[in-house]
Amino acid sequence: MVHFTAEEKAAITSLWGKMNVEEAGGEALGRLLVVYPWTQRFFDNFGNLSSPSAILGNPKVKAHGKKVLTSFEDAIKNMDNLKTTFAKLSELHCDKLHVDPENFRLLGNVMVIILATHFGKEFTPEVQAAWQKLVSAVAIALGHKYH
């Protein structure tokens, strides 16, 4: 289990409160699909993923990105119990969708980049460390069913 200090929790929640989940979620998933094109195989029903502009403009990518980032709200509310919080999603992604758990880590890293670009100077090294810790812990929780 990962322990978050009060300072880390504050750093995470302060930025989360300013986050445009719809915009950032679509951007994060879109960038994942562009930078790591093999991840596109999990989204066959999303239509045109033929180019970066097609991916970033795809309404299904944006909608699913929002859904993914919305699930991070559960992580923020349950930082001390991520394994239980993501147990059902872990099972879904492992047993039904067969998603490589490495993709969770990649998406987390993309999310940190999105945060840095959106928040600039507010995204201090301390804030980055707290968010990196959270996305890593979420990736581990999502990959738990695989072990």
UniProtKB/Swiss-Prot annotation:
How is this protein annotated for GO cellular component?
blood microparticle; haptoglobin-hemoglobin complex; hemoglobin complex
**Which UniProt key words apply to this protein?**
Heme, Iron, Metal-binding, Oxygen transport, Phosphoprotein, Transport
| Organism, scientific name | Lagothrix lagotricha
Q: Which residues carry this modification: Phosphoserine?
A: S14, S51
Q: Which InterPro entries match?
A: Globin, Globin-like_sf, Globin/Proto, Hemoglobin_b, Hemoglobin_oxygen_transport
Extract one GO molecular function annotation from the record.
heme binding
Q: How does it assemble?
A: Heterotetramer of two alpha chains and two epsilon chains in early embryonic hemoglobin Gower-2; two zeta chains and two epsilon chains in early embryonic hemoglobin Gower-1.
What does this protein do, in the record's words? The epsilon chain is a beta-type chain of early mammalian embryonic hemoglobin.
Instruction: Tell me if Transport is a UniProt keyword of this record.
Output: yes
Tissue expression notes: Red blood cells.
Q: What is the name of the protein in this document? A: Hemoglobin subunit epsilon
Any one Gene Ontology BP term: hydrogen peroxide catabolic process
